[in-house]
A protein has these predicted regions:
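A glycine-rich phosphate-binding loop feature that marks nucleotide/adenosyl-phosphate handling sites
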Residues: 117, 173-176, 226-232
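Conserved ATP-binding subdomain of kinase catalytic cores across diverse folds
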Residues: 1-131, 157, 161
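Flexible, glycine- and charge-enriched loops at secondary-structure boundaries
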Residues: 84-87, 91, 142-149, 195, ...
């Protein structure tokens, strides 16, 4: 097929020899099957911000570290340079996440290069060497659903231990090869410790997985893996090989509203006293 304009620089640099076909078009990127020498890989072409259909991207970028202070200031101001840097940060976030998670024992595609908004990475394949199907396209027996769901929960735990939450995990960005699930699409992955939305995103990720596999194994629908793992994470007790039960006892203790109000009043009183002393040092 005709070489897409965005992939041409990779061809010019000898990274890609042939574009075979478009594999999929998503809300944040188009993916092509490409030939690199004797290897068949895929090229993920990120869409520009104005063409992406990724809602509330700002929530996902909260807590991300920007190494260069000049870049951080430009991004905060929203200048043309800042928007360009914001785009590069969005794209490189996926590369960083892929390397981090692979080292953490999470099954993800292997990245090879990222150039001008194009990520060259492993093409995940099935037993016949064809592009692996998405989870949404694979039927399961009850037994296999339980096995794969357990694998996904294990990967989510390892991600959290590595400091990341996927943030957009669903049956549409998990591939199934001969060895089980492979997690994809990570540009929006969030910093678990620095993003105020991380807990809610984790719960949504796990709920999506549980709902899908629960179609085949209904007993999964009553599990509370997200709440269990987050509680352990907050207490510093979550480890990559932590064995979860899927059970979580919600706190039944009533909130001490009166006590909280007393603390607030005490803080206000202290601040008022401090201001009085500042105005009248004698």
């Amino acid at each position: 097929m005709k070489i897409p304009k965005r992939i041409q620089p990779l061809v010019d640099d000898g990274l890609v020899d042939e574009v075979i076909r478009r594999l999929k078009s998503g809300k944040e990127a188009d993916v092509y099957v490409v030939r690199c020498g004797q290897d068949i890989r895929c090229a993920k072409v990120y869409k520009e911000a104005e063409n992406r259909n990724f809602k509330q991207a700002v929530q996902y970028q909260e807590g991300r570290k920007v190494r260069n202070s000049r870049d951080a200031r430009a991004m905060a101001k929203g200048s043309k340079f800042g928007r360009k840097q914001q785009e590069e940060t969005w794209q490189t976030a996926e590369v960083d996440a892929l390397y981090l998670l692979a080292n953490a024992g999470v099954r993800v595609p292997q990245p090879y290069a990222c150039l001008d908004g194009v990520l060259l990475m492993e093409l995940v394949t099935d037993e016949d060497g064809l592009a692996a199907p998405r989870l949404s396209d694979v039927p399961f027996s009850k037994e296999q659903a339980l096995i794969d769901h357990a694998a996904m929960i294990r990967y989510v735990v390892r991600m959290l231990c590595a400091g990341l939450v996927h943030g957009d995990l669903s049956e549409f960005n998990v591939l199934i090869d001969k060895d089980g699930p492979v997690i994809t699409d990570l540009p929006q992955a969030v910093n678990a410790a620095a993003n105020n939305h991380a807990k809610a995103m984790l719960e949504r990720d796990v709920a999506n997985m549980t709902h899908y596999y629960g179609q085949y194994a209904p007993e999964l629908l009553g599990t509370k893996y997200a709440k269990e793992m987050w509680a352990l994470y907050e207490d510093g007790k979550l480890h990559p090989e932590t064995s979860l039960t899927g059970e979580f006892a919600e706190s039944t203790q009533a909130a001490d509203v009166e006590g909280v109000l007393e603390e607030i009043q005490a803080v206000i009183a202290e601040e008022q006293e401090r201001l009085r002393e500042a105005q009248d040092p004698y």
